[in-house]
Amino acid sequence: MTEVYAIYGASGCGRSLMPVAREHLARQNITAQIYFIDDSLTDSSQINGHTALNYQVFKALSAEKKFVLIGSANSQVRQKLANKLEKDQIELWSVQANNTIIMDAVDIAEGAALSPFVSITSNIKIGKCFHANLYSYVEHDCVIGDYVTFAPGVKCNGNIHIQDHAYIGSGAVIKQGTPD
C-alpha cells in the first residue's frame, strides 16, 4: 500500500517536528518520504532536505493513504486545517519522539505531536491535535481538551482539566488539582 506523510506548516513549529516525524516512521520501520505542506508556495521547494509543496499539489499526489501532522502552534489554525483534512479524507497523523514516555491508561486522540522528553503519566485523556513541546509533562488523572498547546517545559500536575484551545506558556507550572 502506498502511503504519503506530511507536516502541514513549514515555519518554526513544523520544522521542529520534522525530525520527530522522521524518527517516528523509522521506529515503525516505515520508509516513506515526508513532505512539508506550505500554502504560500506556488512551486515546490526544499526545506531542511524535504520537499515542500502547497496543499493542492499534496492532494494530487498518488497514494492509497495520506497522513498529515499539523505543525502550527495556533490552535485555531490547527482546527481549521484538521477540518479541511478530514473533509478531504486525509488522516490526522500523530507522532512522538523516541524518548517520549507514555504510561498506563492514556487515551490520546489523533493529530498529537509529542516532542522529545515529554512524559504522559497514567489515567489521562487528551483531545485532538494536542501539542506537547520539549520537556513538558502531564501527570495522572488529567483531562485535556482539543487543540491544546503546551509550550516547552510545561508542568501539568495531577487532576487538572484543561479546556479546548488553551495555550500554556513556556515553563508554566499548573498546581495539583483535586479529584472529581
Descriptions of predicted regions:
Residues H24-S45:
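NAD(P)-binding Rossmann-fold cofactor-contacting core
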Residues A21-L25, L85:
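Active-site catalytic pocket residues across diverse enzymes, especially alpha/beta-hydrolases
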Residues L41-I102:
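Phosphate-bearing ligand-interacting subdomains
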Residues I7-Y8, I37, G71, G169:
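Short hydrophobic segments within beta-strands
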